[in-house]
């Protein structure tokens, strides 16, 4: 059994570079730059009304996305992966 696997592995290693295989993604890393801060144009009470509505529907992934957008506007936004500009108090 091993006698068949060794030549097969050697053949794959030798023919691999000749196949010209390239990685699918040639550009830079899309996650290298932090995403822009999302915009939440509504009030806080609107946010909680949406949370209650999505809870009634059982749409928990949508609640997570909406919460990330809402809380990105507070100082803890940098912990969510967004670049928050420096704000003086």
UniProtKB/Swiss-Prot annotation:
Cysteines paired by S-S bonds: none
InterPro entries listed in its UniProt record: Otospiralin
Q: Which UniProt keywords apply?
A: Secreted, Signal
- For the keyword Signal, the answer is yes
Q: Which domain of life is it from?
A: Eukaryota
Signal peptide positions on this chain: 1-21
Q: Mind naming one GO cellular-component term on file for this protein?
A: extracellular region
Tissue specificity annotation = Ear specific.
Q: Which GO terms describe its biological process?
A: sensory perception of sound
Q: Which Pfam families match?
A: OTOS
In terms of PANTHER family, this protein maps to: OTOSPIRALIN (PTHR35073:SF1)
The entry sums up its family as follows: Belongs to the otospiralin family.
Q: What is this protein called?
A: Otospiralin
Q: What is the lineage of its organism?
A: Eukaryota, Metazoa, Chordata, Craniata, Vertebrata
Q: Which gene is annotated as encoding this protein in its UniProt record? A: OTOS
């Amino acid at each position: 059994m091993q006698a068949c696997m060794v030549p097969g592995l050697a053949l794959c290693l030798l023919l691999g570079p000749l196949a010209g295989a390239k990685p699918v993604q040639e550009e830079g890393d899309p996650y290298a730059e932090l995403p822009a801060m999302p915009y939440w144009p509504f009030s806080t009470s609107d946010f909680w009304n949406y949370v209650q509505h999505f809870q009634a529907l059982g749409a928990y992934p949508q609640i997570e996305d909406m919460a990330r957008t809402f809380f990105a506007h507070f100082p803890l936004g940098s912990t969510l992966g967004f670049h928050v500009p420096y704000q003086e108090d």
